[in-house]
Amino acid sequence: MNFSIVSIAALLISIWLISSSTISFAQNSRSQNMASQILNNQTLILPKSVRNFVILIPNEAHESPLLPKEQRLINQPYVPQHLFAPPNINIAWFSGDVGHTRKVTLEDQNSETIFDSSIKFNSISPTISFNNSETFSYYEEDANSEDPNFVLNGTITINDPQMQSNNNTSSQSTYEIMSTLMVPTKDIKEYTELLEDNQVDILGQEFFIDLREAGSGGANQTLLVLGSNGQIDDTISVFKKITASLPYS
């Protein structure tokens, strides 16, 4: 009798442990998907509950991929280059392009300019609110003197049906602010601790070899997807600390 009770208890504990591991694996996989989705598809589909998002302008964003020698670190001028977001969201751009002032010109689907802002290195643009369901495009021309035809470009799509049918990042999030950041892999522990100390959580990460590398030495950059619930100014102040300390700053 006692043996049966012990056996049943052991079985229940085993089931609970397996279920917990499965849930944890699913959550981790979903988080990994956000970072890999950006890196592989230049796209991110946000959870519906996010109210603020900061797009990263990465270091060397102004370098053209058509030049003889690759100078970019990541395969897109904005991270993510294509954003699918819920309505009633505020979006801004943070520039990590060392030594350069970037410019963002935003147009609606009628090609009318609705936002135009210059952004100094290690600073954030004014925030713009998006409510209407449509696709907006943004760009910067004349960013590279060696390739005058090169244009930095990205899109923001609000409330697209794709968000309803293909939101593999989860339909809800406990974070009101989400963002992206790129840091050297060798220093990931240092930056992880700084983020955690300031209540900025890592929701996903993807290690990759930057485009300047010849393919040896392994993944030397890490793309982070971040979430927080504090004030956006507090989150950006953490970004500024990290960006100012990066080896290419």
Name every feature range the model reports, one short phrase each:
Residues 27-30, 35, 42-64, 119-167:
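Extracellular/periplasmic metallocenter environments
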Residues 177-190, 228:
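Short, surface-exposed ligand-recognition loops at beta-strand->loop->(often short) alpha-helix junctions
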Residues 48-88:
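N-terminal edge beta-strand
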Residues 194-198, 235-243:
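Short amphipathic alpha-helices in soluble, non-transmembrane regions
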Residues 1-30:
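Secretory targeting signatures
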Residues 186-206:
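Short amphipathic alpha-helix segments
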Residues 80-100, 104-105, 125-132:
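Beta-strand cores of secreted/periplasmic/IMS beta-sandwich domains, seen most often
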Residues 203-206, 240-249:
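Conserved short beta-strand edge segments in small beta-sheet-based binding/regulatory domains
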